[in-house]
Amino acid sequence: MSRFFANGSDSESESSEEEVQASNFNKANNFQFSDDEEEVKRVVRSTKEKRYENLTGIIKTIRNHKKIKDIPNTLSSFEDLTRAYTKALPVISKEENGITPRFYIRCLAELEDFINEVWEDREGRKNLSKNNSKSLGTLRQKVRKYIKDFEEDLARFREAPDQESDVDEGEGEAHDSDAERAGADSDGGIGAGTGKLAELPKAAKLVPTKVAADEDDSDDSIDWDSDTESETESSEDENLYQNMRERFLKRTTEKEDKDDDKRKDKRKEQKHKVRKRADDDEDGEWETVVKGNVVEKPKMFEKDAEIDIPLVLAKLVEIMSARGKKRTDRRLQIDLLFELRDISEQHELGTPISVKIHFNIISAIFDYNQKISEPMKLEHWALLLEVMQSMLKLLLANPEINMNESVAEEHEEYGAAPYFIRGCPLAAVERLDDEFTKLLKECDPHSNDYVSRLKDEINVVKTIELVVQYFERCGSNNERCRIYLRKIEHLYYKFDPEVLKRKRGELPAAGTAPSSVEVMDKLCKFIYAKDDTDRIRTRAILAHIYHHAMHDNWFQARDLVLMSHLQDNIDAADPSTRILYNRMMANLGLCAFRQENIKDAHHCLVDLMVTGKPKELLAQGLLPQRQHERSAEQEKIEKQRQMPFHMHINLELLECVYLVSAMLLEIPYIAAHEFDARRRMISKTFYQQLRSSERQSLVGPPESMREHVVAAAKAMRCGNWQACANFIVNKKMNTKVWDLFYESERVREMLVKFIKEESLRTYLFTYSNVYTSISIPSLAQMYELPLPKVHSIISKMIINEELMASLDDPSETVVMHRSEPSRLQALAMQFVDKVTNLVDVNEKVFDMKQGNFFQRGNMGNRDRGYNRNQNNQGGNWGGQRRDNRNQRNRNQRGHHKQQQQQQQQQVQTIEEE
């Protein structure tokens, strides 16, 4: 045996018994640690450690994917994470009492923040690839659905997120458990001589980690300390080994474990400091970090400079000269203007200079957002409103100040009254109004943000009212028309219930503020008289009609439409004016329906509904189209033309009113012209809905609004007014449609009345050939109508020659006249017409196939005639056969006409008998 494997003791005074024991111990160690020669360390882990290690590994993968914005792999890793958490649920419920680990909640919170950040970056989303964009939408939906089960845990986490990294905590727990297990294995494998190895990890747990005062300490100092500690402990380690082989075997030592613990503690400490520093920064204000050297804020004036109006104006020109240039700090420009305003107010330089600075601040705020199509930030919006109202109040409080865009800069006057300032408050308020519309379009209409933004309309209207007061004092007619139109556009779509109450006499007309209808009349009449442009007058007329229709002034609205001839030249108007025209026609149709003018309501709505695109025509959304039907630029322009959500007209209400009006007109017309082959369709859309329902083999109970109207139409065709009314007026239809009207109960009563009247007309048209006479009181009882109303309906039908009958007043009956053909006769006549048309069509097709359209003696076709003659050996047999066939067809046609005349004569003789 080599001396290398001899006893590790150097003393020669040991006994032979000790040598035997050492040799036996050496054999046992050789057998027991045979795996160590392959440098493999067996570790037995619990189920909890396996599951937690799997979760932490996937979380690290997700974090790496998020850093490089690899969204598809983030999606797949998130799916793996949910599956791993599902597997770990039994362990969590057993070990953690069902409490979700904090590192898992942190991962979900970070993932949600990452998705929200990417989703809110609209420009970045546009640049994403198709795969990334699709994966982002899928990931967003899955995460939002998944975290609903962890809402309480996420809320608690977001209240106190400044704790140690949970993934590191999970690793620390796993490491501690591995160390404990290593100690247990050493107790069982090595024996009592290595008992200190089992105690060292526990001692390492109990010793707290020292926090270095200097943040620049690195891991090198830790390694240096660990090396010095290892030298002092080397003598103790030598006593733990019984032979030289065990000492020099490669293994994971206690020193290495201790060094790893120190490094990990150091990393945890540094991460905790960084996170705490970031949280402290969040408590303060945000600062813009400028690339390169930090530029100091320029000084406004010299220390001993005398502040006067020319100096302030020169500084104002200097600040505004950088407007629109590249690399201009727009935020700094706004701050400098505010500082200049404060300086001018401190030195009491006068109101005119303050107004001038206010106007330049407004221009600078507008310039901050370089992309005109995008809305401005909310902080700038609030600042803009404040500065605008402050400037207008100064202008109204000082009548000697005249602010106009026609004033040249060299003619501005700030020293003595009257003051002249170059600027246009009208253009500023128009831009303000446009920015308000952009803000509304950008918000989700079903969120609280939209409601918050809509509350700003009060301030916008106040600002417009201030401009109206200013231009009524010193403005031209053109400027007044422009600002009046802005006020009209904020007023025309709003319903004022006091107008209807005054109309009914519920409110006194005198001694109260003017109603919205009176204000609209005043503004619109001024525009009608003073406007020089067709566009402002056209939009004012459309808004005026819309407002009249909102308040049930049907005749005034109708007269304005007819006298203005808008329908003749609206095609030449701009798109926004055409959209306003469509909105006006839709609201006019609703007004006609409420005022019991069913035919007028149908005429107003038919152009909108027959196209199948009322949503686009009213600018309330875009319909999905094919790839090449609309370019990206066109779609962007159309989105800018969309109306804000609070100005939308309910499309289901429009369609229901249109279909009900069509039903009340179409069903009696179909019954009156049942056997007329050439009858026209009043409403193509309604007719298609009715025919598609009739083609179905099995029709269930109605569910949608369209199905209710179709079912009501079928009931009306049979004269069953009660079933028809139940389909139109019920709880579901009330919720969807009729409750949207202002006086819904009156509308429902009007509907039931019209259903009774039109059902009566349909019944008389359908069953008039069955009766010889009908009692008017029985009809009144059947349809629950007053007797004079039934008498009036039947009289109108007789006068218009719709019903061949006469009234017998003494007996109160309707006597039917048998002038119209019976059902069999009408069908026979219809059959003859169709057969005749079919014969004519067949003859034309046959003649075209045989070439009968060539004229005889056509010299341009000599060659073909010569060849045909050669083939027929000088005889024109084909032409003779064709002439004979044509003669035979003419004879047959004459025979059919004779038969038709004979049938008509027979019908007349039967009727006379």
Curated annotation (Swiss-Prot):
Gene3D superfamilies according to UniProt: 1.25.40.570
Gene designation: eIF3c
Compositional bias annotation for Acidic residues: 11-20, 162-171, 214-239
Region listing for Disordered, in residue ranges: 1-31, 157-195, 208-285, 856-913
Protein's UniProt name: Eukaryotic translation initiation factor 3 subunit C
Organism: Drosophila virilis
Basic and acidic residues: bias regions: 172-184, 244-263
Main location: cytoplasm
Intracellular or extracellular location(s): Cytoplasm
Lineage: Eukaryota, Metazoa, Ecdysozoa, Arthropoda, Hexapoda
